[in-house]
Amino acid sequence: MSKPGVWFVGLFLLPIIVAFTALKLDWIPNETTNHGAFLEFELRQPELVLDTEWTIAFQRPQQCDEQCQTMLQSLPNLYTALGKNQHKVSLVVLQQPADAPIKNTQTVNLEIAKLKDNYLYLVDKTGLFVLEYAPSVKLDEAREVQKGLLKDIKKLLNYSRSS
């Protein structure tokens, strides 16, 4: 085999060997940097296609318990914490009765069986549910969950701006 042919084969095989070695020796990190959990199923709701890049949806149960009240009380603070990104993100409460409006939120009367009650969901501009955030009864823990959601949304907004 000629010298250029050896170089060609070597340059072709080297990345394959490095990739295979990286997989076998666990050089690739297993964890992700997001704070929410990826949904294990694909769920797309065209009703949630709004004029914003992202939507934060809260799945309100039929009977609003203490956990639900804590999450509902902290939603306006979450919207305020978005700061300059407020125009890029919508807040939506799913299954909210009409007699209890919340500042800066929209109401969508959807019953989605796959969604867990009291969870926050991050929905993209096509209506695809991407991440879920577990609820908390304690206000301090709810704030920590929302801080993680804010970090995720800011990262996503930054990435979408660069593409």
List PLM regions with ranges.
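Solvent-exposed, acidic/flexible segments
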Residues: 64-71, 142, 146
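A short, hydrophobic beta-strand/beta-hairpin element that forms part of a small beta-sheet core
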Residues: 75, 118-135
